[in-house]
Amino acid sequence: MGETNTAAQPSQEFEKVLADSSTDVASFDAHDKTLLQKLQHFLHSSPAAVPLIVLVLSLIAFGVILGGKFFSAFTMTLILQQVAIVGIVGAAQTLVILTAGIDLSVGAIMVLSSVIMGQFTFRYGFPPALSVICGLGVGALCGYINGTLVARMKLPPFIVTLGMWQIVLASNFLYSANETIRAQDISANASILQFFGQNFRIGNAVFTYGVVVMVLLVCLLWYVLNRTAWGRYVYAVGDDPEAAKLAGVNVTRMLISIYTLSGLICALAGWALIGRIGSVSPTAGQFANIESITAVVIGGISLFGGRGSIMGMLFGALIVGVFSLGLRLMGTDPQWTYLLIGLLIIIAVAIDQWIRKVAA
C-alpha cells in the first residue's frame, strides 16, 4: 500500500500543477498592414489584376474619347482578330517564361511551321491534313531541341533560342526559296490551311476560328497550370529548380516537355497565321517573338519565373490591341503606339519588382 501511495503522489502533484497553470495560448503582437502593403499582397496573389485594371481603364478612356465609333461590336471583335496570333504565340512564351527562361525563336518556329504546311501540300502533293500534322510535328521538334539544349546541356535559354531563331529563320528562307503561296491557290486546293481564317457571326459581332482557338487554348492552359500537378511543377521549376528537384520533380523532363509544348503551340499559331493572312509567306510574322514577350510582360508575368497568370498574358495582348486600334482611330502617328507600349513594358517590369518584395 505504501508503494501505491508513493507512485500516486507524483501523478497528483502533476495534476495540481496542470490545474493551476494558465490556459492562455501564446500570442504574437499583431501589426496591422498598411493599405500599400495590403495592395502589394493582393497583387502578389492575383498577378492578372494589374493588366485587367489597365485593360478596363484603356477601354473606358478610348470609349470616352471616340464614343460609339470605338464601342461597337465590329471594333471589339476586330481587336480580338488582331491579337489572335499574338495570343497563341504568347501562350507558348508564357510557359517558357514561367520557368525563368525566354524563347526568342517562337516567331521563327511559327513561320517555318506554316511554310512546311504549305510546301508539303503544293510542292510534294501531300494531303493538306497530313501537311498540317507535319507542320505541327516540326514545331514540336524545334521546341524539343530547345528544351534538350537548355535542360540537358545547361545552356542559357536566351542563347539557345537566339541561335535557334537564326537557324530556323535561315532554314525557312532557304527551304521556301522565299516563295509565297497565293491565297487563291490555297483556297482552291487546300482550304483546310485557311480554316482559322473562316468567320461566323453572333449578332453584329464577327468572330474567326482563330479567335476561338486562342480563347480555348488560354482557358485550357489556365486549367492545366492551376489545377494539375504538371502545372504546379511548371511554377515550382521557375521559382526554384533546386528546391523542385529536392521535392521530387524531374526538372530536366519538365523543361523538355515545356519547350516541346511551346514549339507545338507555335506551330498551331503558324496554322492560324495562314488563315489570318490567307497565304503562306516566309516573311510573315517577323516580330511575333517581340510581340509575344510584350504581351507576357504587360500581362504581369514575372521574367524571373515562378509567378504570373496566363490570363494576364491574354489581357496584355488585348491592351496592345486596344492601344493600337484606338490610336489608329484617333488618327495619331503610329509611332505613338510604340512609345506608349514601351512605357507600359517598363512600368510593368517596375511593378513586378515592387511586388516581388513581398516574396522576399
Curated annotation (Swiss-Prot):
Molecular function in Gene Ontology: transmembrane transporter activity
Induction: Induced by fructose.
Membrane topology category: Multi-pass membrane protein
Keyword match Repressor: no
Keywords: Cell inner membrane, Cell membrane, Membrane, Sugar transport, Transmembrane, Transmembrane helix, Transport
A Gene Ontology cellular-component term: plasma membrane
Origin: domain of life: Bacteria
Spans through the membrane: 48-68, 84-106, 125-145, 155-175, 205-225, 254-274, 284-304, 310-330, 335-355
Disruption phenotype: Disruption mutant is unable to grow on fructose as sole carbon source, but can still grow with ribose and mannose as sole carbon source.
Signal peptide annotation: none
Compartment(s): Cell inner membrane
Subunit structure, interactors included: The complex is composed of two ATP-binding proteins (FrcA), two transmembrane proteins (FrcC) and a solute-binding protein (FrcB).
Protein family (similarity comment): Belongs to the binding-protein-dependent transport system permease family.
Described purpose of this protein according to its UniProt entry: Part of the high-affinity ABC transporter complex FrcBCA involved in fructose uptake. Is also a high-affinity transporter for ribose and mannose. Responsible for the translocation of the substrate across the membrane.
Protein name, UniProt field: Fructose import permease protein FrcC
Species assigned in the record: Rhizobium meliloti
Underlying gene: frcC
